[in-house]
Amino acid sequence: MANFKVSRVETTPFEGQKPGTSGLRKKVKVFIQPHYLQNFVQATFNALGADRVEGATLVVSGDGRYYSKDAIQIITKMAAANGVRRVWIGQNGLLSTPAVSAVVRERVGADGSKATGAFILTASHNPGGPHEDFGIKYNMENGGPAPEGITNKIYENTTTIKEYLIAEGLPDVDISTTGVSSFEGPKGKFDVDVFDSTSDYLKLLKSIFDFPAIQKLLSSPKFSFCYDALHGVAGVHAKRIFVEELGANESSLVNCVPKEDFGGGHPDPNLTYAKELVARMGLSKTHSEPNPPEFGAAADGDGDRNMVLGKRFFVTPSDSVAIIAANAVQAIPYFSGGLKGVARSMPTSAALDIVAKHLNLKFFEVPTGWKFFGNLMDAGMCSICGEESFGTGSDHIREKDGIWAVLAWLSILAYKNKDNLGEGNLVSVEDIVRQHWAIYGRHYYTRYDYENVNADGAKDLMAHLVKLQSSIDEVNKLIKGIRSDVSNVVHADEFEYKDPVDGSVSKHQGIRYLFEDGSRLVFRLSGTGSEGATIRLYIEQYEKDSSKIGRDSQEALAPLVEVALKLSKMQEYTSRSAPTVIT
């Protein structure tokens, strides 16, 4: 048993270590500066306080992006020096964000210990590699992201930090092999437990879904399946879950070997970046696929996001969460007793609202950021929730969960096809979506992302939109001058949320223009990029007339798109003639 001692290292603050909704994200070149990561980790320990750190059991893992392995060793040594009793690390340092949440909530160590929190090393859907992004966030004992009270303290601490603690004489831990390594320090024993990355997560998923029913679907010659992990950490879980447990053919897995640079790609599961899957599913504009699979899905870098596709058919994330909620009680055993409630982020379409109304469910509209859902779940008020940004999840953990969403869709397909895997036509993904629209109406929806725009220009654009809201009459005059065929604005505001659980108020959560016919325009500045500002524009139109629900989305939304771009003076403020990504 190796002994270590504790060193106090003098340091000075770095500017800009303010964690956003998903932790601290910066370029790798920023993180590898001497003391940079250490300052943030020590600021986190100090914010948590001795009672939450000394004797604690912490999970330290991530999506495997460049610099993760070095960061794991640094955090482990700092944990030892700060009096943490145990560090749990997924084999090779790999755990998806939902798997971390599952481990914190469910795993019991060999000595009966339970995790009290986690450092997750991820920048989610942002690119990885020496010249790309790295990130770190802290999750609490409920498996969810640290609340603002903690993240604000972390930031305050980064502005005044003078020293950090690190173990001296503690060797690097071999994270490629499972097993427990024990060490002795000034405060007693310190253990590092490297464990199988998928077992605890899989056990939880098997308690939620009817795996034999999904297996029956996947083994049917009628059904074909494709899963693309975009070289992110979800690939670690995919083979075990889809191939070994559910019997899918290994050839159905694409890009499922995790890579530090995500294979040079952008690990964001949308129609722009998941090119290989999009082509395979028959949705490429340049490549014709004669026989696409029935079902396809993609994950992001840390496995918490998902994109769902049918044969030549894209399911919007806003529709996806609504359809899962509408079918959950029948198709997913975990929900057989009913749903406690449902929730969506404000920019997400109102498709879920209509389902909640029909099914008489509690409904919540929250700001962007999974922690708001976590509060509702901890209070027993919400079972299923989702975001338009390809995040879907439930109260089984406190993070969004990409593989959970895929299994939810496979469960719905298995349920709808339980009597026709032999004779009869398969009920397809497209059939399920169109049946949903026929019952609940369709929310035509698109999102325009303007990435890495000049921060001052972005702020000026938002200020312009807020100023316009002072006179709805003036706004409607401007709109009629742009398009006479667009409905009137009846309400305009900056979205503000009062949490029904703790009473906290979140202001300035996005600018909204709500129209008489149920249409919406929403503008947000996003804080998850590592450089510049990202403006997100959300455009939504509700159509109840069943004869009009089959139109092309961009065609149906064209009048509102024109209004949004001209009303906001998008090109004038951003110098961009087109968005970076259209979803």
From Swiss-Prot:
Superkingdom of the source species: Eukaryota
Gene from which the chain derives: PGM1
Gene source species: Solanum tuberosum
Known role: Catalyzes the reversible isomerization of alpha-D-glucose 1-phosphate to alpha-D-glucose 6-phosphate. The mechanism proceeds via the intermediate compound alpha-D-glucose 1,6-bisphosphate. This enzyme participates in both the breakdown and synthesis of glucose.
Cofactor(s) essential for the protein: Mg(2+)
GO terms for biological process, alphabetical: carbohydrate metabolic process; glucose metabolic process
Keywords: Carbohydrate metabolism, Cytoplasm, Glucose metabolism, Isomerase, Magnesium, Metal-binding, Phosphoprotein
Positions of modified residues (Phosphoserine): S124
Protein name, per record: Phosphoglucomutase, cytoplasmic
Binding site for alpha-D-glucose 1,6-bisphosphate: R25, S124, D304, R305, T368, E387, S389, K400
Binding residues for Mg(2+): S124, D300, D302, D304
Keyword flag Cytoplasm: yes
PANTHER family tied to this protein: PHOSPHOGLUCOMUTASE (PTHR22573:SF2), PHOSPHOHEXOMUTASE FAMILY MEMBER (PTHR22573)
PROSITE patterns, per database record: PGM_PMM
Residues at the catalytic site: S124 (phosphoserine intermediate)
Compartmental location: Cytoplasm
EC number(s) reported in the record: 5.4.2.2
Example of a GO cellular component annotation carried by this entry: cytosol
Pfam families hit by this protein: PGM1_C_vert_fung, PGM_PMM_I, PGM_PMM_II, PGM_PMM_III
Catalysed reactions listed for this entry: alpha-D-glucose 1-phosphate = alpha-D-glucose 6-phosphate; O-phospho-L-seryl-[protein] + alpha-D-glucose 1-phosphate = alpha-D-glucose 1,6-bisphosphate + L-seryl-[protein]; alpha-D-glucose 1,6-bisphosphate + L-seryl-[protein] = O-phospho-L-seryl-[protein] + alpha-D-glucose 6-phosphate
Keyword ATP-binding: no
Coiled coil: none
